[in-house]
Amino acid sequence: MNKLALTLVGMAFAVLPAAAQDFDSDFSFGSWDDFNKVEITSNDKRVETSIKFAFPMYFGTSVLTDVTYNDAWGAFERQYPNFLAMDARKNFVYGIEMVSLHARTGAVDLSLGVRWTFMNFTFRDSAYSLRPEMALGSPRASTQCVPYRIASEGPYDGRKSKIFASYLGIPFRLSLNYGRATVYAGVSAELLMDSYTKYKHPKYRESINGLFNDFRAAVEAGFSLSNFGLFVNYGVTPLFQREYSDAHTLTIGVTLGI
């Protein structure tokens, strides 16, 4: 319930400032060059403001940096060595920005949006996975996520094993536009919406509440030409809860529609 309330507040924060503007009722459906956006625009002599329903998308791969094995995982490192090693080729990241508020003056563009982000992290050793387990020595009933070998649980044919997290966030960007070229830098604040662990053959999926940080902050930069571009994103906050690891994420990929 708290997540829902925070989400609604965040979305309102992104959209409500536009309600204070007197927009011209000018809806336009752009060509592919405008990435099929719907734009509502208000102009004055100095600043142009608009709301865009443009659906820019992000596709990339993510690696873990500054990996540590803290209290909850330190005892398992010898039994499951380097179990946080991930296969970057399969760490797929996808994001879609559903709506954004823009303010432009000359070549400078400020934007505030709402974005869904989906992150998959695939274990390099496909026999490794994580599962909830009752925490030992806890003063009250609680669970923690611990590593284990899938092969020890029954028949397993070595298919990929992964952990998954999805976020709803508010990205803020400062962009400089030069004709069809755009250079931008920004930050984002994101809330964790869902998380689970998954592997195939035998097919298995289980929620892993409490593994990932509930809040994620990131910095981002990118370059695009005619709406096709490259981006890099770094997670300032650790991906996991502090009791597990101080690992951060570094994501690189391509963008469409920025």
Regions from the PLM with identified roles:
Residues 86-92, 160-166, 211-215, 222, ...:
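Short sequence motifs at beta-strands and strand-loop junctions characteristic
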Residues 22, 42-53, 66, 99-110, ...:
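Short loop/turn motifs that connect adjacent beta-strands in outer-membrane beta-barrel proteins
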Residues 49-57, 106-112, 179-183, 215-219, ...:
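Outer-envelope beta-barrel architecture signal
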Residues 59-67, 116-122, 189-195, 227, ...:
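Transmembrane beta-strands of outer-membrane beta-barrel pores
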Residues 207-258:
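Predominantly the C-terminal beta-signal and adjacent terminal strand-loop region
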Residues 72-77, 123-137, 200-206:
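Flexible, surface-exposed loop regions and adjacent strand-edge segments
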Residues 1-47:
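Cleavable N-terminal export/targeting peptides
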Residues 63-95:
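Surface-exposed strand-loop-strand hairpins of Gram-negative outer-membrane beta-barrel proteins
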